[in-house]
Amino acid sequence: MAPRAIRLGVLTPSSNTSLEPLTQAMIASLPNVTVHFSRFPVTKISLDDDALQQFHNDKILAAAQLLADAGVDIIGWSGTSSGWLGFEADETLCAAITEATGIPATTSVLALNKACQEFGVKKLGFVTPYMDNVQEAITKTYATIGIDATKERHLRMSKNTTFADIDEPTLDEMVADVVARKAPAISTFCTNLRAAQRVTYWEKEHGVPVFDTVSTVVWDMLRYCQVDMSPLKDWGVLFTK
């Protein structure tokens, strides 16, 4: 019998329409890896109480348990909420997932932070769709780990479904603007942006690493599972580390 494929479990915001096709496209070049998704309710991104309550762990843990039913090898939260909630939110979530399921867990943001360590990044430019106060919270959160996140562009949007409608020319202009402000590395920081497929173009165009948050969680899960990521080199320099 052939060895069982490595199974990645991905937690997905219910209104997200970008991360699943992008993640599937990445994994398509890895013949012994499959990816499986589980959703929980998220419809808007803001600092309002009802929006923050979407990220309470009980709903996320219920979605994680469904992934555990599939016998996945690792669970990744493909979302950026700890950027404004604080990194401890993701750390607590990962511990709770492992305690409930026995399966290791990671997140887009914790993986991004690992990537910054790997690449020696102390100044990180941000491209996001978020509201002013959400972006300000992200900047403050990154300051807690010594990363300057003040070079940024954001679009002052809050409805999650609309993030997927942001087109490549808009993202191209935003990335170019943040690079022009002397950001030595960039993060497209929202997993409902259709951005991961554009990373290699931006890296070649601007000569800086670009860490997309759909990509970071995939990278960290594959690292944990000791998967050869060389087939993913066309998704960005991240996958060469």
What spans do the regions from the language model cover?
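N-terminal glycine-rich anion-binding loop in soluble enzyme alpha/beta folds
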Residues: 1-62, 132-167
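Periplasmic-binding protein-like
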Residues: 9, 73-78, 125-127, 183-190
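Short, well-structured alpha-helical segments in soluble
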Residues: 57-70, 170-183
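Hydrophobic alpha-helical segments within soluble ligand-binding/sensing domains
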Residues: 58-61, 103-122, 215-228
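Glycine/small-residue-rich loop that forms an oxyanion/phosphate-binding "nest" at active or ligand-binding sites
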Residues: 64-106
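Conserved beta-alpha
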Residues: 93, 97-158, 239
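Short, flexible loop segments at boundaries between secondary-structure elements
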Residues: 157-162, 208-230
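Hydrophobic alpha-helical
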Residues: 173-205, 217-218
